[in-house]
Design a protein with these regions (language model features):
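Carbohydrate-recognition beta-sandwich/jelly-roll modules
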Residues: 1-63, 160
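Aromatic- and carboxylate-enriched substrate-binding clefts and catalytic-loop regions
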Residues: 61-207
């Protein structure tokens, strides 16, 4: 029955983590991906924010409005990676946009893909052996770079971060493609002393 399935899922989650970071309030809201698909603007995001605020009028726990892919400076139809320190012309000042969203009575949220960045100034030692456009999470400087990206998003005023594609970028395939192997080929992380699980846990701790 549905109840038994739910309880089974709860039990499974408890086995995975016996000290979860639970919130006192419900996290809910909107995300513009499933109609914009990366083609939006500050004007449209503010319109989305106003609509969401109207739909949730009177609710003390305010909703998040998540701005998905498309805001970053190098966004194009064929690229959805970083850098993440500035928005493109359709979005303008990202801190000002967050403030305008908050003024609409929603909580600002933002999307980013932390491990994918083709910027020419990224050191070669930070790159994954398997794909030079992807960061190697075993490199300490990479984790600090990602931490700085996240600090920037927070300093702009975004309260929720949707970080995306991370396991795909690390392994080079989706979960349903893995089968008996997590990845393809014989590549390795720069740091050979830690397991993949240890590296991913540290990566998520940094985020």
């Amino acid at each position: 029955t549905p109840v038994e399935v739910f309880e089974a899922c709860r039990a499974f989650c408890s086995e995975m983590c016996d000290d979860p970071d639970c919130r006192d309030t419900v996290i809910y809201g909107g995300n513009n991906w499933y109609y914009a698909y990366g083609k939006s603007s500050a004007r449209e995001i503010l319109g989305d924010s106003a609509y969401l605020a109207e739909m949730t009028e009177g609710i003390e726990n305010r909703p998040f409005m998540v701005m998905d892919d498309g805001w970053q400076i190098d966004h194009s139809d064929s690229y959805n990676g970083g850098p993440w320190r500035v928005g493109n012309a359709d979005y303008g000042d990202m801190g000002e946009l967050a403030a305008q969203m908050r003024a609409k009575n929603v909580r600002p949220g933002i999307w980013f893909r932390p491990l994918y960045d083709h910027s020419a100034d990224i050191p070669a030692e930070w790159r994954l052996e398997r794909n030079a456009e992807v960061f190697d999470i075993s490199v300490p400087e990479v984790l600090e770079h990602i931490a700085q990206d996240i600090r920037q998003l927070g300093d702009w005023g975004y309260e929720l971060i949707k970080h995306d594609f991370s396991t795909y970028d690390i392994f080079g395939c989706w979960g349903f493609e893995m089968g008996t192997r997590l990845t393809n080929g014989s590549w390795r992380f720069h740091d050979h002393t830690k397991t993949t699980a240890e590296l991913i846990v540290r990566f998520y701790e940094v985020i």
